[in-house]
């Protein structure tokens, strides 16, 4: 088993996935750096506003571009990433995104005008600013996936994990010097205009050098096909984003921005586990797809067993560390964030239990069970909404954590059960 894992690591270094993982971990470190700078220089309500808008961009941005950052590689990869395919798909996706962007802006404009949303003026202002910039946010995400299709993976991941935070870092530097710290959220929002323009320039320059020849079998995808393929993926992606964002939306509604900040800090600490699970999942993704297509279920069992052990042992090590040093970790962000210590402990235990389910997400995705995955996550979102409505008003931060844990356990273990019934493969971690 370990020789196979060693082989996977060597292959990962050779095909740049090691460097991709390095950049993704760098992205997590940047998230912690921005959180540290926020929590040590701004009031908790400002930190909460930042985390609320960050979640808003994730969910609404994915909706208006129909999760093209997830689907674009499929749409152009079918024709070997040929030049004319990239141009055609890129133009169609930008058109769809722009139409939905305008529609989204008008809907919120009408809703706020007639007071359909019961939010304060600060939140309303933040949402409308974000709606104005959403198109640029989507352009940036679409651009970096095109860069990946052009085989500039390193450039793509650098934009995703490092350059994305540059406007915010400039904001920290300039505003603290000028004494206008209350403008920091604007740097985050409007920074996506700069990133969209910069990524577009880089994409244009690199695309000029791209010479992959015309594919004689190429047939232009119509808008109907793009919608038909993208909608199920959008359901899965938005549902997944909602699972990590609904708690924040409800905490903001019931308790305000400061509670969003307290919860988000704990949630970001636990995000290290998610990064590790995703990295392990990516390292075996192609092997899962290949062996499933061949019908080699013995090989599949070996892959899921080895990845399940890696996921569990990493989760256990990290969770134990967090449980022992939870107070020390939270105090780094400021004494007021110690209020979320019990929340951090709950999330750690919950994620450790979830890690027993192994690599459920990637297995379903790579074995042609994407629709099942989408339905599972969507059901988990509904459960999460109901639990949040019941638990958050009474238990605040702990209620949000419990809701999140139950939802995650639901879709992971139900997914593992479905895999066992369908493929006769036990994807759960086993000690032997």
Please name every model-derived segment.
Residues 75, 137-159, 349-376:
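Membrane-interface junctions at transmembrane-helix termini in multi-pass inner-membrane proteins
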Residues 128, 158-209, 379-383, 397-420:
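Hydrophobic alpha-helical transmembrane segments
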Residues 11-69, 73, 133, 228-258, ...:
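Signature of the first transmembrane helix
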Residues 16-27, 53, 62-112, 125-126, ...:
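Membrane-water interface segments that mark the loop-to-transmembrane alpha-helix transition
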Residues 9, 14, 46, 112-130, ...:
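Interfacial segments at transmembrane-helix termini and the short loops linking adjacent helices
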Residues 50, 54-62, 236-240, 244, ...:
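Transmembrane helix-bundle signature of multi-pass secondary active exporters and lipid flippases
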Residues 1-13, 121-122, 178-191, 200-244, ...:
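Interhelical loop/hinge segments that connect adjacent transmembrane helices in multipass membrane
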Residues 64-81, 149, 270-295, 301, ...:
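Helix-loop junctions and terminal segments of transmembrane helices
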